[in-house]
Amino acid sequence: VVPWNAQMFLTATKLAPALAAGCTIIIKASEIAPCSLLYFARLIKEAGIPDGVVSIITGDEKNCAIPLTTHPDIDRIAFTGGPKVAKQIVINSSENFAVTTLELGGKSPIVVFEDADIEGAVNGIIAGNYGASGQSCVAGTRVIVHDSIKKVLVEMLSKRAESIVTGDPKNNETHVGPLCTNKQINLIEKTLKKAKSQGAKIVFGGSRLNQKGYYFEPTLIDCPNESIVSLETEMFGPVASLLTFKDEKQAIKMANNTKYGLGSGLFTNNLARAHRVSKKIKAGICWINSYRAISPIAPFGGYNQSGYAREAGIDSINDYIRTKTTWINISNEPMK
């Protein structure tokens, strides 16, 4: 079961190990944006995969997802999406004890230490928050910066933000495209309004663009404390929230102050610190001096309400096979 964002990558991480293990697969496309996978069905046919090995279906939760996840012939369910739907899938799958892999949301931290290459950190923050219009489960939406470098980092981020072009993704000059639904924009606006009432300040952005389509400005919110609503709400849009810290211990505590645990990023030139802090951050992925790099050979998945199990990497095939112990008596001697 795949969402509407990053459909081909998320399908591939599920389909490849399943095919390698000799399984037949049903892919449930998002009802919001099914066209990519419907076209992919043609490519499956052209590739020579026999009919019935891979099926792609579309439909809503009631008519498609629920019948699939409760069907007795379904042995395994791999889901990418939100925690609310995931909890229902776990309940549904318990009817038949189907094995599940859940890759859910996140409020990933990007921690920038005082010894970091600030330009590199700015690149990571831009890519981690405004790439794909912020519609990414690993978006680094909690930017946690040492207080001694906050001013210069914010200045560099603001300058870079001025050069970001938001518009039609078919135009070559566009950097940030539209959001998928108006519902996302409404959630962003509601969250920003609440954050400002709690004392947060908009550094740049913060508004819906006055043009046709679901466009929202790349946005940075300066948060005075960790209770600001934008630090806990997954908005799935181009919005980052900024916090400052004074020492390493506080940075780790801030990074782990979330119910999620999918991605994380560290920017530092101290290799010992990078290893030390990455071990203490409760997240399934940690990028050091980079952000949002993905490879099919690297395991992908999270902790806590970001889900469990892993996709991609050699271990992913283990979820699609079963271990069987077979004892064979090759002796003609009577059983003792």
Q: What is each model feature region?
A:
Residues 1-120, 245:
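Rossmann-like NAD(P) dinucleotide-binding subdomain of oxidoreductase/dehydrogenase enzymes
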Residues 19, 26, 55, 78, ...:
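Structural detector of well-ordered beta-strand residues that form the stable sheet scaffold
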Residues 22, 54, 77, 106, ...:
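Residue-level signal for inorganic ion chemistry
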Residues 24, 32, 61, 83-84, ...:
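Gly/Ser/Thr-rich beta-alpha loop segments that engage phosphate groups in nucleotides
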Residues 51, 104-106, 137-138, 172-173, ...:
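Short glycine-enriched loop/turn motifs at secondary-structure junctions
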Residues 74, 111, 165, 198, ...:
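Conserved C-terminal structural/oligomerization subdomain of aldehyde/semialdehyde dehydrogenase
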Residues 84-225, 288, 335-336:
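ALDH superfamily catalytic-core signature
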